[in-house]
């Protein structure tokens, strides 16, 4: 089954400009997410047929990206259309090349349609929710891979000197304290995209996903040396905030000890600081309107 699906996927992608690096990056992302879906499904103890279905959800989750790039020249949904919705349109013509099983078609369409939503909607069946969650979890893990393998300029739109002068906004730091992903309008600071990537780990829902991320070391590497740079910042407030973020993540990420999940994350975070933020001279934050532009171009993260 997988060989025929890979052949169908590669035949579909061959219609687009293979010399465009963005196509190659999206193909790589697709393969990575599909394999992560397989790994997560196996780790959660799903039967072989469901593991194959999870893998296929991963293979097709970004099928709309190629036509999006062809029509609009961008991977940014804000500057074109919803790539998830476009993927559903593509699959109306292409789904038969991958499966004709009505139940599989329904699950795949749900996973594709909802993989990039900020939250899953109420009303999904348990089975729909499971495959949507596997797909979303796998996508988040691979976004962290992208952060590890990309430059600061490519991801945040700032060079290394600007990185050292960067700011973490109140809004992003508060979202981190709440242990949740950042919405697109919660990223005004030049380093908020980096904080947003770290926050992806908070919303990995399945134990097998957290294990997959831990095994790959993407988060640890990002905390230790983001974009291959030393995380030393000119702003004292930024440095305190980054140190607090690192300390909390090292203490909480993938920690299964009883009581960890119930601890107030903001209290824990603030307890990590050597002094309160009120004692620091908080200046105006950098307007980071261009931060993450390149990442949005690739993944609309």
Show the residue positions of the predicted features.
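An active-site-proximal "capping" alpha-helix that borders the catalytic cofactor pocket
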Residues: 32-40, 81-95
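Acidic/histidine metal-binding catalytic segments
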Residues: 45-56, 96-113, 127-134
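Active-site flanking loop/helix segments enriched in acidic
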Residues: 6-32, 65-77
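Divalent metal-dependent phosphate-bond-processing catalytic cores, especially two-metal-ion Mg2+/Mn2+ enzymes
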Residues: 21-27, 31, 35, 39-47, ...
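His-Asp-centered metal-binding catalytic motifs of divalent-metal-dependent phosphohydrolases/nucleases
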Residues: 51-76, 87, 107-118, 301
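Post-HEXXH active-site segment of zinc metalloproteases
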Residues: 70-85, 153-157
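Short gly/ser-rich anion-binding loops that grip negatively charged ligand groups
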Residues: 23, 73-81, 94, 98-102
């Amino acid at each position: 089954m997988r060989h025929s699906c890979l052949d169908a996927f590669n035949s579909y992608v061959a219609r687009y400009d293979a010399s465009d690096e963005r196509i190659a990056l999206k193909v790589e992302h697709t393969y990575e997410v599909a394999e992560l879906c397989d790994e997560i499904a196996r780790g959660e103890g799903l039967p072989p047929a469901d593991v194959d279905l999870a893998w296929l959800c991963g293979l097709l989750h970004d099928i709309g990206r190629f036509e999006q790039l062809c029509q609009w020249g961008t991977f940014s949904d804000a500057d074109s259309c919803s790539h998830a919705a476009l993927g559903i349109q593509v699959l109306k013509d292409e789904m038969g090349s991958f499966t004709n099983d009505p139940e599989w078609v329904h699950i795949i369409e749900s996973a594709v349609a909802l993989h990039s939503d900020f939250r899953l909607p109420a009303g999904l069946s348990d089975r729909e929710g499971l495959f949507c969650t596997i797909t979303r979890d796998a996508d988040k893990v691979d976004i962290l891979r992208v952060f590890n393998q990309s430059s600061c300029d490519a991801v945040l739109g700032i060079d290394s000197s600007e990185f050292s002068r960067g700011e973490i906004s109140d809004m992003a730091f508060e979202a981190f304290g709440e242990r949740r992903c950042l919405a697109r309008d919660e990223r005004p600071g030049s380093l908020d995209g980096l904080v947003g990537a770290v926050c992806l780990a908070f919303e990995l829902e399945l134990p097998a996903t957290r294990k997959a991320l831990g095994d790959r070391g993407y988060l640890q590497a990002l905390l230790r040396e983001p974009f291959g740079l030393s995380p030393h910042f000119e702003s004292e407030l930024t440095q305190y905030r980054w140190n607090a973020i690192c300390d909390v993540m090292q203490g909480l990420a993938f920690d299964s000890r009883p009581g960890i999940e119930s601890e107030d994350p903001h209290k824990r975070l603030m307890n990590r600081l050597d002094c309160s933020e009120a004692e620091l001279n908080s200046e105006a934050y950098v307007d980071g309107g261009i931060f993450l532009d390149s990442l949005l171009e690739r993944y609309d993260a």
